[in-house]
């Protein structure tokens, strides 16, 4: 018999996370590493676990994540987005709760491009009157 698993893809900035929810005890593996070893900061671990804590499904699923691109904050946001989408596939009744919390919305904020004549996206060279 085939294993029951729920897939979800999350994105944030340049990061893409492919998330699999498998019935289990609440383990979170990111790129085959424990979440404690992957994310050094506690705040990033909290961000990743938010959808599971909100819906009360922390102990029902093992979370297997493959994430690439971007930095740590972008990756944490992408994982949260992917977990939320996978939870909706597992139980449609969770959708209003997750939508209200904003976990199903793809954060559209991206890095602004550098403009010519400037040092960065908005940072101008120092102005000298004389």
UniProtKB/Swiss-Prot annotation:
One of its GO terms (molecular function) is structural constituent of ribosome. Keywords: Ribonucleoprotein, Ribosomal protein. It comes from Clostridium beijerinckii (strain ATCC 51743 / NCIMB 8052) (Clostridium acetobutylicum). The keyword Ribosomal protein applies. Transmembrane segments: none annotated. This is Small ribosomal subunit protein uS9. The keyword rRNA-binding does not apply. NCBIfam families: PRK00132.1 (NF001099). GO terms for cellular component: cytosolic small ribosomal subunit. Gene3D superfamilies: 3.30.230.10. Belongs to the universal ribosomal protein uS9 family. GO terms for biological process: translation.
